[in-house]
């Protein structure tokens, strides 16, 4: 289970473990909380009062300090799992829906034609379609794209990089994705 760590201004910074969240709470770095309580940690006993220390962790925390991520400079890292999630596990050529192990990263302009490995040049393809297209462009292979590639926003990237998002975390993130996002479909 992960905690969504935000800057004090509400920009996503990272997915952190419960233990990392406890460190932020103990260091008084949590400025605000959102979402529900997901864990409760008990510590030692105060020698004077006899009270046990308790830290309750919420699913979303806003922390003090300067944001580590500038949303305007961000270029999300490209991984197959994020690519397949962006494209909803749908082949860009035949439109079939596949399991992740049956999909490939397909370069629209192939490396053989000086194509680059970036979000705007890759789509999800099933193995047969990727093999059929080979080192050709979609036009040369007479295989038109069924959808256009795009670079995920900061908010979409945080959704794409975590498979076990709690409902309140998803609600928070999805409220900020662009209206044109495929993740809303």
Regions found by a protein language model. Give the residues of each.
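Internal, conserved structured core segments that host functional sites
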Residues: 81, 87, 95-100
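Histidine-centered nuclease catalytic patch
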Residues: 76, 96-124, 133-149
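Short, hydrophobic/aromatic-rich beta-strand segments within well-structured domains
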Residues: 3-4, 91-93
